[in-house]
């Protein structure tokens, strides 16, 4: 995946992670978890996974 694609995915994953942390709605949690799984299944390369994880963590830290 290109770095641009990874950045876009990281932003979306950070948004979804924020929803998971803040919602009490079990249906919303389930749909959000499914969307996260769908997105992360698109990444096959280990280096891309690590880079994506670091990007998401950075974005989540900036939110705090």
Language model features by range: what are they?
Residues 18-19, 26-64:
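Short, charge-rich amphipathic interface segments used for partner binding and complex assembly
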């Amino acid at each position: 995946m290109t770095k641009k694609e990874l950045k876009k995915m990281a932003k979306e994953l950070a948004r979804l992670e924020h929803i998971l942390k803040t919602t009490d709605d079990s249906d919303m949690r389930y749909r959000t978890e499914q969307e996260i799984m769908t997105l992360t299944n698109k990444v096959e390369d280990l280096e891309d996974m690590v880079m994506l994880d670091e990007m998401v963590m950075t974005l989540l830290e900036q939110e705090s």
